Amino acid sequence: MAAALLRELGALRVPNLRIWATQTLRVLPPSCIHTSASLDISRKWEKKNKIVYPPQLPGEPRRPAEIYHCRRQIKYSKDKMWYLAKMIRGMSIDQALAQLEFNDKKGAQIIKEVLLEAQDMAVRDHNVEFRSNLHIAESTSGRGQCLKRIRYHGRGRFGIMEKVYCHYFVKLVEGPPPPPEVPKTAVDHAKDYIQQLRSRTIIHTL
């Protein structure tokens, strides 16, 4: 008799436990849970091409054209791409293409293709008269998707490998490149260090 009563109570508790678990663990509705990897893809860089500036005043120098272009989800490391992106920063478009032409790295050819696309876009969409009258104002790389995959080892073991992707962003500005900055000497660095020490303050005081 007691055993039958316990079995009935156990049978009643299990469904109640399942109902309680489904009600309490459901924090968000299923439609609000994003399982795709497209959330980290922002299109703000391309939208900068649609910025409309106010009309310029008479006698004001002409505002140079700005071209924003990028390529996303490149099967390449963002750190390797950063070195190439930094190399062409501040160069004219012709000089950058010449430097990338003789670079044997995979990312150099990708950046070259992006620069040629941006150059065509400048002439076609941004009223740039001379395609060589452009310089690279900004050039950088960003982190893309990072997919985890299984790497099979011997004796039934395995490891986790990552397939990394990166983004490349470039901004072209009409006109010649700005002159390079004069490198600081040791005396200039010493003066900056002394000025930094003199400008120190004690926090939480009058």
Swiss-Prot record:
GO biological process: mitochondrial translation
InterPro entries per UniProt: Ribosomal_uL22, Ribosomal_uL22_bac/org-type, Ribosomal_uL22_sf
Stated family: Belongs to the universal ribosomal protein uL22 family.
Protein name: Large ribosomal subunit protein uL22m
Gene: Mrpl22
Domain of life: Eukaryota
Protein location: Mitochondrion
Species of the source: Mus musculus (Mouse)
Record-level GO cellular component terms: mitochondrial inner membrane; mitochondrial large ribosomal subunit; mitochondrion
Main location: mitochondrion
Pfam families with a match to the protein in the record: Ribosomal_L22
MF annotations from Gene Ontology: structural constituent of ribosome
Transit peptide location: 1-40
